Amino acid sequence: MYQPDFPPVPLRLGLYPVVDSVAWIECLLAAGVRTIQLRIKDKRDAEVEADVVAAITLGRRYDARLFVNDYWRLAIKHQAYGVHLGQEDLKTTDLNAIRTAGLRLGVSTHDDMEIDIALAARPSYIALGHVFPTQTKQMPSAPQGLEQLARHIERLADYPTVAIGGISLKRAPAVLATGVGSIAVVSAITQAADWRAATAQLLAIAGVGDE
């Protein structure tokens, strides 16, 4: 059995929106979301520090699991709940500093080789994607689909996992049926005609996660 070498997270993190602004963080936490990620890309630390601080403050106010994507130094400095890193970030990040600071770590993966790399770091959770085609970001790999996702879940057994990539309200039940512990969503909420209704429906399907 694989054991994380970072502080643990619940096996089921529930609905896990990934958003690029503090405004979305505040709206979704107020709507009942309890696991969320701030993902701001391609800016210097100084440019995003105020947003990171505001997001972490909101996370504490709502007793939520607030992950910061990429900006691990700021996450440590301001004591976020956790950090999420991509495969390339793993090579340049001081993982021991994150661990010593008591922050949780999530790592993105796209195939078996990247899962091996993630497992070597023994993070708090492993993200598996992209499950379906996605317009949110350019992806060099092909979508994995539900069968491949289910195979990864079987391999990872009781390790906390998150599925990401093209997960819509309609697709969410089938994704969760693979046994994955959480679904990360972006456009299913941010591009919904009624984001409040979409969030409520997704929460009803995926839950808020375990305590």
Swiss-Prot record:
HAMAP family the record matches: TMP_synthase
Pathway: Cofactor biosynthesis; thiamine diphosphate biosynthesis; thiamine phosphate from 4-amino-2-methyl-5-diphosphomethylpyrimidine and 4-methyl-5-(2-phosphoethyl)-thiazole: step 1/1
InterPro entries associated with the record: Aldolase_TIM, ThiamineP_synth_sf, ThiamineP_synth_TenI, TMP_synthase
Keyword Cell membrane assigned: no
Record's protein name: Thiamine-phosphate synthase
Reaction(s) catalysed (UniProt annotation): 2-[(2R,5Z)-2-carboxy-4-methylthiazol-5(2H)-ylidene]ethyl phosphate + 4-amino-2-methyl-5-(diphosphooxymethyl)pyrimidine + 2 H(+) = thiamine phosphate + CO2 + diphosphate; 2-(2-carboxy-4-methylthiazol-5-yl)ethyl phosphate + 4-amino-2-methyl-5-(diphosphooxymethyl)pyrimidine + 2 H(+) = thiamine phosphate + CO2 + diphosphate; 4-methyl-5-(2-phosphooxyethyl)-thiazole + 4-amino-2-methyl-5-(diphosphooxymethyl)pyrimidine + H(+) = thiamine phosphate + diphosphate
Keyword Repeat among record annotations: no
Domain of life: Bacteria
Cofactor section: Mg(2+)
Family stated for the protein in its record: Belongs to the thiamine-phosphate synthase family.
Function: Condenses 4-methyl-5-(beta-hydroxyethyl)thiazole monophosphate (THZ-P) and 2-methyl-4-amino-5-hydroxymethyl pyrimidine pyrophosphate (HMP-PP) to form thiamine monophosphate (TMP).
Chain residues that bind Mg(2+): 70, 89
Enzyme class: transferase
Enzyme Commission number(s) of this protein: 2.5.1.3
PANTHER family: THIAMINE-PHOSPHATE PYROPHOSPHORYLASE, THIAMINE-PHOSPHATE SYNTHASE
Gene Ontology annotations of biological process type: thiamine biosynthetic process; thiamine diphosphate biosynthetic process
A GO cellular component entry from the record: cytoplasm
Residues that coordinate or bind 2-[(2R,5Z)-2-carboxy-4-methylthiazol-5(2H)-ylidene]ethyl phosphate: 134-136, 166, 186-187
Keywords on record: Magnesium, Metal-binding, Thiamine biosynthesis, Transferase
